[in-house]
């Protein structure tokens, strides 16, 4: 029971980190495109 909860927490944590990286990459790309215009 406790092990499954910890695994679920790790999966959620990795998902949040991945989403944060994608959002940061998209944001930096958006800023670059604005500067180019």
UniProtKB/Swiss-Prot annotation:
The lineage of its organism: Bacteria, Bacillati, Cyanobacteriota, Cyanophyceae, Synechococcales. Belongs to the PetL family. The chain crosses the membrane at residues 7-27. GO terms for cellular component: plasma membrane-derived thylakoid membrane. This is Cytochrome b6-f complex subunit 6. One of its GO terms (biological process) is photosynthesis. Its main location: membrane. The 4 large subunits of the cytochrome b6-f complex are cytochrome b6, subunit IV (17 kDa polypeptide, PetD), cytochrome f and the Rieske protein, while the 4 small subunits are PetG, PetL, PetM and PetN. The complex functions as a dimer. Keywords: Electron transport, Membrane, Photosynthesis, Thylakoid, Transmembrane, Transmembrane helix, Transport.
